[in-house]
Amino acid sequence: MAVLPTSGHPHSYLITGGASGLGSATVDAVERYGGTPLVIDKNPPSRDIAHVCANLADTEAVEKAVAELADVAGGSFEGVFTAAGIDSCGKLEDVPAAQWEEVLRVNLIGTAAVVRAALPYVRAGRGRIVTCASTLGIKAVSDATAYCASKFGVVGFTRALAAELAGDVGVTLLIPGGMDTPFFDGRSAQYRPPSTARLAKPEQIAEMVLSAFAQPAGCELRELVVCSSEEASWP
């Protein structure tokens, strides 16, 4: 069980993609353990949570959203989790260039933009950063060039960031396998998990995010590969 740090005031956790899927599960977990979630998402959360609607592909909008939520939090974040992500399945030559590039802008550039903007507030809160990659960030598959490129990028970005911030801000790379979330909704049948697929529950992965946030000063969970015990994408 995660135990979030306490210091006599509510701790605030910035979560991208917090309106659905893993992000929403992490919002619930933060509240369950006594923290205050703050959400950036292109869609509003289904319940009353402090949030700003923004497209992570728009760096200027991201910077404004982070600053606005930092004001709500009193100028500090105890944690940042970059859960937002999109995909555009298909062979490279079949995916329109604009869609392909949007995946990289949201998943990779958006992750970096959020972390860059949030870093002063994370330092102020002596907080931690958890980025979200994927098992497809360490194992490539066909018809996923945009997603794999973006998530391999998140892996490299986070490893470099951890080295850059060592001893200053804790950084954890989360590498989840397939999850039972709306992420697969709207895909053609060939790109959806089969009915027999063993997918992790987002609530389980969210617990691991909070475990990273809850580590004592000087102790880092550098990388977490978390998936169903029968996950097909890893190893």
What function would you assign to each model-found segment?
Residues 19-20:
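Conserved glycine-rich cofactor-binding loop
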Residues 115, 150:
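Active-site helix of classical SDR
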Residues 83-88:
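Conserved NAD(P)H cofactor-binding loop of Rossmann-fold oxidoreductase domains
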Residues 134:
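Residue(s) in the substrate-gating loop at a strand-loop-helix junction
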Residues 167, 173-174, 193-234:
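C-terminal helical subdomain
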Residues 120, 162-164:
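Alpha-helical segment proximal to the catalytic Tyr-Lys
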Residues 91-92, 96-101:
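Substrate-binding pocket helix/loop in short-chain dehydrogenase/reductase
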